[in-house]
Amino acid sequence: MHEVVTISVSQRANHLTTQFFNIQEGYLQLSKEQQVNDSKIFLNSVVDKVSKTISYAPRALLWDARTGNGSLGTYQYSESQDYHFGNEDKFKEQTVIKTHPRIPKSEYQSSLDAGAPLPCLNRENTMYWSDYSKLIYGPSSFNILRNWYHDTENPNQPDFQNLGERKFDRYSIGYDEFTENYLQEFFDGNLHRELEKCDTLQGFNLVSDMESGWGGFSSALLVELRNELPKKAVFSWGHNEDDPFTDDFPMKRLSKKWLPIISNKLRSTINMMQESDLYFPLYAAPGLTNWETAGKSCRIFDSINATISQSNLEQRKTMDYLTTAITLGYSSRNMVTGMVIGDTDYSFCSRVLPFKNSHKPNSTHIFSKSFIDRGNQTHKHHSEPDSRSKMIEMYTHRYFPSDTIPTEFSNDREFVLELESSEKNRDIFKHWNEFVVRYFKNDSDREELKNELSDYASAYESGWYEDEDSGDDDM
């Protein structure tokens, strides 16, 4: 069956995961003749022999802060029991502490439960991913940061103890949080239970944020995941916002205030690349809510996963096939440079300004290019990836967006996704290396980071470059 488990780490990541599984729910509504994918790859089926029905739950593990699950969250003293939902007898001898008002169920969820017409979704009624989630997750899917609370004003950075004094905003905070408080519990508990439901596990999707403590948290999780399951494929997906190195950022000059943000981003990226088979750096555009960002990025996320789960076995690919198609066997070139549909590039890499001695944009070397055609073909010839071929063609069924995806991101249902690995990635690592040289004065891993960034920059080099100057003076 070759199941794929999705590990979603952060509020923003959970929005993308929700949109993806809402699409999976839509496939279940298709008739047997209309089926285009194998639902069991991403969904766990449970047969009720009494009612003779089958229910499906996502093969997913979601991490969030307290109250980040919205109406699905718990507001009680014990994390493992829910005082509000029929367990009152278990709490007779305990003191229940309520730290905040209960979050009401969304109108969309209430309508789903009642079988009533569904309301239109908008920026205001999609604050939480659970506001519009269609599938019912198993109890072992939920993982909560015990000491960090969801902040509705800043949903991507949890607040420590809900005090408004400390944010989940550093790589080191997230890394230590997982290794010190959750590593053993997660791997022996919920992850183990999820893996027991798989017959032949193919791999994982790991979705996270790169600029906050979630980047460190997911990095620590990923390191241990690789140690535990070294032969399973991992595709990592990281959300990246604009920074002083991107072309749309208003600042023309770097300042030290960017140290923690860029530090988070570069450390998280290095870890994702080292521990993943492929890393997809998603661009999170300013002005979009998490619901909108997820609706936009889901076109990419779903396209990759549709390729490995489609019911057409002649066209279906494996995660290993996709990895080879993009890297051509060069494991250090596993960050996807371009994710293009039409005129839109969904990758953060395309936003980065050229480094001072980079080649001109129209002469950037392309190491590999792959196409995923989401048309309505019944059969197409496809090429096999090898070190001599730079262009790979793949085919899958058309896009079936859920009605929870914003209209502006769901109109085009037949398109071609272009995946590219190019010299452009060098710009990112050269910028970051220069940043480390100038700002990381007392960091214990300064030299290690410089070497790693230089190695990655070299991996994406092609041809000759003019000499460059780099010093330790502040910008």
UniProtKB/Swiss-Prot annotation:
Signal peptide residue numbers: none
Functionally, this protein is described as follows:
Involved in the partitioning of the mitochondrial organelle and mitochondrial DNA (mtDNA) inheritance.
State the name under which the record lists this protein: Protein DML1
Organism of derivation: Saccharomyces cerevisiae (strain ATCC 204508 / S288c) (Baker's yeast)
Q: Which InterPro entries match?
A: DML1/Misato (IPR049942), DML1/Misato_tubulin (IPR029209), Misato_II_tubulin-like (IPR019605), Tubulin/FtsZ_GTPase_sf (IPR036525)
- GO-annotated cellular components: cytoplasm; mitochondrion
Short name of one Pfam family: Misat_Tub_SegII
| GO BP annotation list | mitochondrial genome maintenance; mitochondrion organization; plasmid maintenance
The reply to whether Cell division figures as a keyword in the UniProt entry is no
Protein family membership: Belongs to the misato family.
